[in-house]
Design a protein with these regions (language model features):
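Core catalytic lobe of class I
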Residues: 2-254
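Short, conserved SAM-binding/catalytic segment
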Residues: 21, 256-266
């Protein structure tokens, strides 16, 4: 069991990179140094809850975007997605750090709110963004869809038009369509929070949803800031491989123990 987890990783040259065994391993080291030793285009999905830099805590220090994107863009496959959780004001900084590759956001609607100290001045906060970046259209497996036995027709609706419009000049949608698939996902994900083993731990269900959406079974997901190992747990539950880094020894050990508890006893 112990061979899955390493406290250090020796530096590797270009030749050694291709032979590195990093699948289903969490490394206790700085992620920027660690990612530099991964092969080019070796990762199917990058999923990470980066430090937001909004709490002043030691573990919440911002990573340098230039160095982070240099490694992310080198190791992600051409059809891979980079999915990063965030909340304002960090979201604006994150999107501005790579505007050409930013595509859209999901919105995690939380059942637990924050911001009570400022409740008389601003609304309580119950949403975090999940920002999606990619070079080329990635794997996309929409979750929760229903496939019908027979196609249904969706008629284009006539609407008033004036000035610029996304509709045709005659005021109608482009055309009627037939489909066998309904209930495509919307941007808002209502998933309950988890009281976890890390101050900012995300729900396993949220990460499972993202992993199943942007990867296929057997592919590999990298989390550069593993925390308590939620990404690894979600990968195991989803039939995907994981790899990643956590520099804090206590959180690293928590992640290791969490993953071990899910693996069959030899």
């Amino acid at each position: 069991m112990a061979e899955r987890f390493f406290h250090t990783l020796e530096r590797a040259g270009p030749t050694e990179r291709s032979r590195m065994d990093y699948t289903n391993k969490i490394f206790n080291m700085d992620c920027l140094s660690g990612m530099s030793m991964y092969p080019d285009k070796s990762i199917d999905l990058i999923l990470c809850d980066l430090p937001y830099g909004i709490t002043g805590c030691r573990w919440d220090s911002l990573l340098p975007f230039d160095e982070l994107w240099k490694q992310y863009l080198r190791i992600i496959k051409d059809n891979g997605a980079i999915v990063l959780t965030s909340c304002q004001p960090f979201t604006t900084k994150l999107i501005s750090s790579q505007p050409k590759l930013f595509r859209y956001c999901w919105y995690w609607y939380k059942n637990m709110v924050t911001g009570f100290a400022n409740a008389k001045k601003q609304p309580l906060r119950c949403v975090e963004e999940v920002c999606v970046f990619y070079k080329h259209p990635p794997t996309y497996n929409p979750q929760g869809i229903i496939v019908l036995d027979k196609p249904v027709k969706r008629r284009g609706k006539s609407v008033p038009t004036h000035g610029d419009s996304v509709y045709r000049i005659d005021g109608s949608l482009a055309h009627d369509t037939e489909t066998c698939v309904v209930h495509y996902p919307r941007q808002v994900l209502e998933i309950k929070c988890e009281r976890g083993l890390h101050p900012t731990q995300k729900p396993v269900a949220l990460f499972e949803y993202i992993i199943r959406t942007y990867t296929n079974p057997g592919e590999i997901v990298l989390d550069s800031c593993m925390g308590s190992g939620t990404t690894a747990v979600a990968c195991i539950n989803s039939g995907r491989n994981y790899t990643g880094f956590e520099w804090d020894k206590q959180h690293f050990q928590t992640a290791v123990e969490r993953v071990k508890s899910l693996l069959p006893t030899p």
